[in-house]
Regions:
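N-terminal "arm"/small-domain region of PLP-dependent enzymes with the aminotransferase-like
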Residues: 2-62, 70
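A broad "ordered helical/assembly scaffold" signature
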Residues: 27-30, 39-40, 54, 65, ...
Length: 211
């Protein structure tokens, strides 16, 4: 969980989330284990009963990943961060965590082709409806909200067109209707934009770009 801090982005990037290393190494070690050892079977049972907060299995938690996640959470002014194997895994994971059969979502028209493929190819299989809107014509957004709209998804600046969306205005509209907002912040990076400060619920990055 990210802590409140007055540190700058450079300090956060270098030091956030790094525990006191027993041998004094200045670079966090890379833990390559798949599982972890426990003193007793009771401790192991307790760890596997709370997989969201303990190092029980590397696919879920790993000390190396935790260091990175803490840095990302602090850079984005968020509480938590979760790392995935790819940017599209993060996008898909966020979408499927927030949307279910019968739900409706609204996406910016200009977005990454991989995200476009998720909506056009896979949403119909999951029974999820969606519409696109042009962020340069904000009046389109409210007209496309339905009773079952659960998410508004932005990508700003868009990849690769650099079309911008007014994050703050979108959040105001979304909050009036009780809708969550997710932003792909890849092209801006947390150095230039912190969407959470405007009311966004989830921020997504592909870390092969600017982070």
């Amino acid at each position: 969980m990210s802590e409140n801090t007055l540190q700058g982005n450079a300090t956060i990037s270098i030091h956030a989330g790094e525990p006191k290393e027993q041998f004094g190494a200045v670079v966090p070690p890379i833990y390559q284990t798949s599982t972890f050892e426990y003193e007793t079977t009771f401790a192991a049972a307790e760890a596997f009963g709370d997989l969201h907060t303990t190092n029980a299995y590397t696919r879920l938690h790993n000390p190396t990943n935790t260091v990175l996640e803490e840095k990302l959470a602090q850079l984005e002014h968020g509480k938590y961060a979760v790392t995935f194997a790819s940017g599209m895994a993060a996008v898909t994971g966020a979408l499927l965590a927030l949307l279910s059969n019968g739900d409706h979502a609204i996406f910016v028209k200009a977005k990454y082709s991989g995200t476009e493929e998720v909506t056009t190819k896979y949403f119909p299989k999951f029974g999820i409806e969606y519409d696109d809107f042009d962020p340069l014509h904000m009046e389109e957004l409210e007209s496309k909200i339905k009773p079952n709209t659960k998410l508004i998804y932005l990508e700003t600046p868009a990849n690769p067109t650099l079309v911008m969306a007014d994050i703050e205005e979108v959040c105001k509209i979304a909050k009036r209707h009780g809708i969550k907002v997710a932003v792909d912040n890849t092209f801006a990076s947390p150095i230039n934009t912190n969407p959470i400060d405007f009311g966004v619920d989830i921020v997504i990055h592909s870390m092969t770009k600017y982070i």
